[in-house]
Amino acid sequence: MGVRKRETADARKEANKSIAFAKLNNCPTSPRKMRLVADLVRGQKVDRALNILRFSSKEASRKLEKLVLSVIANWQAKNPEANMEEAGLFIKTITVDGGMMLKRLRPAPQGRAHRIRKRSNHVTIVLGSINNTQAIN
């Protein structure tokens, strides 16, 4: 690795140390269904997002609720002296990407078979702080 590339990589690594984020990999739900729930909480304050997820009837909301609680715990671990209410935490970014696909065969007429794709997804949540000048993910 070149010197400039190493310096930018080190700078990026230092910037990520102050960011609180959480990832959920290979969640066995289709990305399309997970995005419906993720769009509900994108940009919301953390307590409001938890209420939305808690009272949603979608199955994906249960998994996202646990992920939001995890990212809050990560933020508290990185900022032990800060108060969560005073920081004004909100969901800065939430991304849902496609994950691994399990390919299965379903019998079809006349001896053929159709391929079934069982999809999974990866979810990443980054927190932001309203009252802090430094961006916290």
From Swiss-Prot:
Pfam families: Ribosomal_L22 (PF00237). Keywords: Ribonucleoprotein, Ribosomal protein, RNA-binding, rRNA-binding. The keyword Transmembrane does not apply. GO terms for cellular component: cytosolic large ribosomal subunit. One of its GO terms (biological process) is translation. GO terms for molecular function: rRNA binding; structural constituent of ribosome. PANTHER family: CHLOROPLAST 50S RIBOSOMAL PROTEIN L22-RELATED (PTHR13501), LARGE RIBOSOMAL SUBUNIT PROTEIN UL22M (PTHR13501:SF8). Part of the 50S ribosomal subunit. This protein binds specifically to 23S rRNA; its binding is stimulated by other ribosomal proteins, e.g. L4, L17, and L20. It is important during the early stages of 50S assembly. It makes multiple contacts with different domains of the 23S rRNA in the assembled 50S subunit and ribosome. The globular domain of the protein is located near the polypeptide exit tunnel on the outside of the subunit, while an extended beta-hairpin is found that lines the wall of the exit tunnel in the center of the 70S ribosome. Belongs to the universal ribosomal protein uL22 family. This is Large ribosomal subunit protein uL22. It comes from Flavobacterium psychrophilum (strain ATCC 49511 / DSM 21280 / CIP 103535 / JIP02/86). The gene is rplV.
